[in-house]
Amino acid sequence: MKYQPALQSATLLKRYKRFLADLQLSDGSEFTAHCANTGKMTGCAEPGFNAFYSTSTNSKRKYPQSLELTQNSLSQLICVNTAVANKVVAEAINANLISELSNYEQLQSEVKYGNENSRIDFLLTSDERPNCYVEVKSVTLLSQDNPHSGQGYFPDAPTLRGQKHIRELIEMVEQGHRAVLLFAVLHQGINQVSAAAHIDNKYAQLLNEAINQGVEVLAYKADISTNEIILKEKLPFI
């Protein structure tokens, strides 16, 4: 996914009210940007971090700028716009960059499925293969105890919605389909992914149950720059 035009730089002053972030330009001027992230953003939005933002051409937007990337104290870029995860995954699937999800004939998004009124991120279909249901999760939580370890976690906060998605994936396997939970790693410092049992033990237990029942878990890391993001490196899920 290319940023067109390339992102502009600023300094993050604070992130607040979930959807807002105050930024400061090099000339000292300040403005408020939209922050498309409902999570805690632990370790991703500290005051003083370098920040990179896009500007919308939609004149009706109250906040034309959007916070896209931050850069932590270890100079690692982090994509904090959660909408990007699905975009880069779709591009990677279409470009056959994810071998486990390659060679399907059709890719659909936001398809209703399951018994809990969910929508799957992606449904892959082919005439001679089982349907493949793909749920995407954005991973940006780096271990705070040992940030040099490369250990990433999901979720960064307790998530009933995430638990529901796992139950739905288990149901798809029981119906004879493929079900894949794909962790899109959008943090340069993360080199492996685990379920965050210390944050949401129920989620970790459900995920372990899902794996035992045949749900596939993949983790792919994005190559991040202020010009583009490409999902291409497979990481271990442990």
Curated annotation (Swiss-Prot):
It comes from the Bacteria. One of its GO terms (molecular function) is DNA binding. InterPro entries: SfsA, SfsA_C, SfsA_N. Belongs to the SfsA family. NCBIfam families: sfsA (TIGR00230). This is Sugar fermentation stimulation protein homolog. It comes from Pseudoalteromonas translucida (strain TAC 125). The lineage of its organism: Bacteria, Pseudomonadati, Pseudomonadota, Gammaproteobacteria, Alteromonadales.
